[in-house]
Amino acid sequence: MLKPLGDRIIIEQIQSEEKTASGIVLPDSAKEKPQEGKVVAVGTGRVTDNGEKVALEVKEGDSIIFSKYAGTEVKYEGTEYLILRESDVLAIIG
């Protein structure tokens, strides 16, 4: 499994609907980039200027909303993940 460093987290994106409410199938080019995901791994935390380590607020299993163009997409063992910094997380769902 991938292990993020520092204040980074790894998420699996929750894909958006392929149909509209009225039943129209959307092509890939018309879909918005997903902004929801499930946290699958978290780093050890960020280090402050004075050397203290601050634990992350998100934890494995959290569902989150993140900034639209945040993170780096990676593919590992056939699964696509997004690696982003905790500061790119806008909210924890639930």
From Swiss-Prot:
CDD domains: cpn10. SUPFAM superfamilies: GroES-like. SMART domains: Cpn10. Its main location: cytoplasm. PROSITE patterns: CHAPERONINS_CPN10 (PS00681). Gene3D superfamilies: GroES chaperonin (2.30.33.40). GO terms for cellular component: cytoplasm. GO terms for biological process: chaperone cofactor-dependent protein refolding. GO terms for molecular function: ATP binding; metal ion binding; protein folding chaperone; protein-folding chaperone binding; unfolded protein binding. It is found in: Cytoplasm. PANTHER family: 10 KDA HEAT SHOCK PROTEIN, CO-CHAPERONIN GROES. Belongs to the GroES chaperonin family. Heptamer of 7 subunits arranged in a ring. Interacts with the chaperonin GroEL. Together with the chaperonin GroEL, plays an essential role in assisting protein folding. The GroEL-GroES system forms a nano-cage that allows encapsulation of the non-native substrate proteins and provides a physical environment optimized to promote and accelerate protein folding. GroES binds to the apical surface of the GroEL ring, thereby capping the opening of the GroEL channel. This is Co-chaperonin GroES. It comes from Shouchella clausii (strain KSM-K16) (Alkalihalobacillus clausii).
